[in-house]
Regions:
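Juxtamembrane/transmembrane-helix interface segments of polytopic membrane transporters
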Residues: 2, 49-65, 147, 151-155, ...
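Transmembrane alpha-helical segments in multi-pass inner-membrane proteins
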Residues: 12-13, 158-222
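Helix-loop-helix "hairpin" substructures at the membrane interface of multi-pass membrane proteins
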Residues: 84-162, 185-190
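Alpha-helical transmembrane segments within multi-pass membrane transporters and channels
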Residues: 6-51, 194, 199
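Hydrophobic core segments of alpha-helical transmembrane domains in multi-pass membrane transport
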Residues: 49-53, 94-105, 143-150, 174-177, ...
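Cytosolic-side transmembrane-helix boundaries in multi-pass membrane proteins
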Residues: 102, 120-127, 131-134, 205-255
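Helix-loop interface residues and adjacent transmembrane-helix termini in multi-pass membrane transporters
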Residues: 5-6, 32-34, 108, 134, ...
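Transmembrane helix-bundle core of multi-pass membrane transporters
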Residues: 48-108, 209-217, 244-255
Length: 255
């Protein structure tokens, strides 16, 4: 879309709603037809890799115009903090806003509390008169929208060009972050920026004159993910208490 129209904003929206389309397929298969969620997720992941390679084959190597940075001149010149907090693109600042909105939505609003109730016990939520399937459909579609935004960021900002399998398994790190953050928005945000810092580290280490193999630096975010998951898995009681009790379970309404 960015190549054809020259509009980065339109490309972001197309990417986001492409994520919604794939999420809708997942929702229909798992919520309506009660397919196994893990197997369906893996199948759609493989399908997505192949489909994106097919569609993007004619765009390989074409450089894109990156999204403009939103900089405030007098703030961007502040030592250390200026470069760290100011002069980023729109999606970076949108991520800050979404973290706050997600935390507020889940803890302070009625729809957010209903969503949490469905996650904790779909049978109890159904008994109270809430439409479990509707809530789950909306949650899955929203997740697809955010995943699409993340994919758009990779190809329009992080590396403004298209390359096959450019995600390099980052989605699995995102999945691990949910466990790392014990299903709490603030903790997940901390983990996301922590792993993001580790990812960016590989781009700066060699510039600092540190002699470390680039292959090892590329592996580092995934190694860190495995190490963190092993460490937090030691506290199984805490994870079990925070994890929604109905997560991954098919909903079959009582007749």
């Amino acid at each position: 879309t960015a190549v054809s129209t020259g509009s980065g904003l339109l490309a972001i929206l197309v990417g986001a709603f492409s994520g919604v389309a794939v999420a809708a397929i997942f929702a229909v298969l798992t919520l309506t037809f009660l397919a196994n969620q893990v197997a369906t997720g893996l199948a759609l992941t493989i399908f997505g890799v192949g489909l994106s390679a097919l569609i993007g084959s004619s765009f390989v190597g074409i450089s894109l115009e990156p999204l403009p940075q939103l900089s405030v001149e007098f703030l961007s010149t502040i030592p250390i903090l200026g470069e760290l907090l100011f002069g980023h693109d729109l999606l970076v600042y949108l991520s800050f806003i979404m973290i706050l909105l997600a935390g507020y939505f889940l803890s302070k609003t009625r729809p957010g509390l209903i969503l949490r109730a469905v996650g904790e016990s779909h049978d109890s939520a159904h008994a109270l008169g809430y439409s479990v399937l509707t809530v789950r459909y909306l949650a899955v579609l929203f997740g697809g929208f955010m995943s699409g935004l993340a994919g758009s960021y990779l190809s329009l900002v992080y590396t403004p060009l298209w390359a096959e399998n450019m995600t390099a398994g980052r989605g699995w790190i995102a999945l691990a972050l949910v466990v790392f953050g014990t299903w709490r928005a603030g903790r997940i945000a901390f983990g996301a920026y922590l792993f993001g810092a580790i990812t960016i580290l590989q781009l700066h280490v060699q510039g600092w004159g540190i002699n470390i193999a680039s292959q090892f630096m590329t592996m580092l975010p995934y190694i860190a993910t495995v190490v963190v998951l092993v460490l937090i898995s030691q506290d199984r009681i805490k994870i079990k208490m925070n994890a929604p009790q109905s997560i991954g379970k098919a909903f079959r309404p009582a007749k």
